[in-house]
Regions:
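K/E-rich alpha-helical interaction surfaces of small helical-bundle regulatory domains
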Residues: 30-53, 82, 262-281
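RNase H-like two-metal-ion nuclease catalytic core shared by retroviral integrases
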Residues: 200-202, 208-215, 222-245, 255-264, ...
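Short hydrophobic alpha-helix segments
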Residues: 169-170
């Protein structure tokens, strides 16, 4: 209801609704108003005008309002002097005899035309980014804590952004910048032709100069996510959550070797068997190797075959019922 007039009948209906249910339920009117989503000041203003039509005069032109030609002149003058601020622009127009307006009116006209904040850039936080279209374009890397027998260890994983395939992983008692380099290099050795963009958070291992040099020497690029914004690396954050909820906590590893065994089995299941909702309920291995079109086509074929089978079965059942009905009628 913000920015527009509320019709009187709607306004009075809201008043009647609040009064009626406040009496029936003994819930305060203030709470009902809050649930409805109306400010208390607006509600009590409506109640004071109950039964009367709207008498707003906000859209009646005032004598001091700028005329259309004046607004057009301000916009045209701004286009001729785009680097000037609105205050300087105002007095330049005043001295040049273009229009006689105040700085506030100049600001309103330029703001309504969307001509202010010429150097401002909208934040891209929360808008996402261009998703990879093929495997090995993006590799997400992150480090997470794993509780093993009451001791916390470091788990570092690399996840392919397109297929969600776990490229490589390792558990260590410490996870320095050098350890991360070893894990990334092991992943590169599995896929020698890959030159992905490495996406990470701003952990100390990833902002180190040696890690930057390693990425550059390997022919890859590196992108760090926005600080205090883990959603921008949400793919691998979600992987670590799945690992903990589906593998670590139910499996309860007793020591480091036991944890490696359990995680190895789970990752084999995750990569090759488990259907991933973000990629059309495919196994990451199938997506990685480009088998998704054949799988989708086979699924559609099976669904269509089942529909046709059910259709033919119902037709046969109806025909059989029709024959039985005809025979029964002939006997009678």
């Amino acid at each position: 209801m913000k920015g527009e007039w509320t019709p009187p009948d709607v306004r009075d209906t809201v008043i009647d609704f609040v009064n009626e249910w406040s009496d029936k339920t003994e819930i305060s009117a203030a709470r009902l108003i809050r649930w409805i989503g109306i400010r208390q000041g607006k509600f009590y203003d409506w109640r004071a005008r109950y039964g009367r039509v709207n008498e707003h005069n906000g859209w009646i032109p005032r004598d001091w309002w700028l005329e259309d030609w004046e607004k057009e002149a301000i916009i045209a003058f701004h286009a001729a002097h785009p680097l000037e601020g609105y205050r300087r622009l105002c007095f330049m127009m005043l001295d040049a005899g273009v229009v006689a307006v105040s700085p506030t009116s100049t600001w309103r006209v330029l703001h309504a035309a969307g001509l202010l904040r010429r150097f401002g850039k909208a934040s891209k936080k929360g808008t996402g980014f261009v998703q990879p279209l093929a495997p090995h374009e993006h590799w997400h890397v992150d480090i997470s804590y794993i509780n093993i027998g009451g001791t916390f260890y470091y788990l570092c994983s690399l996840l392919d952004g397109c297929s969600r395939y776990i490229v490589h992983w390792d558990i260590r008692e410490a996870m320095t910048e050098g350890d991360v380099e070893i894990i990334v290099q092991a992943a590169r050795e599995k896929f020698p032709g890959a030159a992905p963009r490495i996406i990470s958070d701003n952990g100390p291992q990833f902002i180190a100069r040696d890690f930057k040099d390693f990425i550059r020497i390997c022919g890859m690029t590196h992108v760090r996510t926005s600080p205090f914004y883990p959603q921008s690396n949400g793919k691998i954050e979600r992987w670590h959550k799945s690992l903990k909820t589906e593998c670590i906590r139910p499996g309860t590893p007793l020591n480091l070797d036991d944890a490696r065994r359990i995680i190895t089995g789970y990752i084999a299941h995750y990569n090759n068997v488990r259907l991933h909702s973000a990629i059309g309920y495919l196994a990451p291995k199938d997506k990685l190797e480009g088998r998704e079109k054949g799988i989708f086509a086979e699924r559609d074929r099976r669904i269509e075959e089942a529909r046709q089978r059910r259709k033919l079965a119902r037709q046969a059942e109806r025909e059989e019922q029709a024959v039985d009905t005809a025979l029964l009628a002939a006997v009678n």
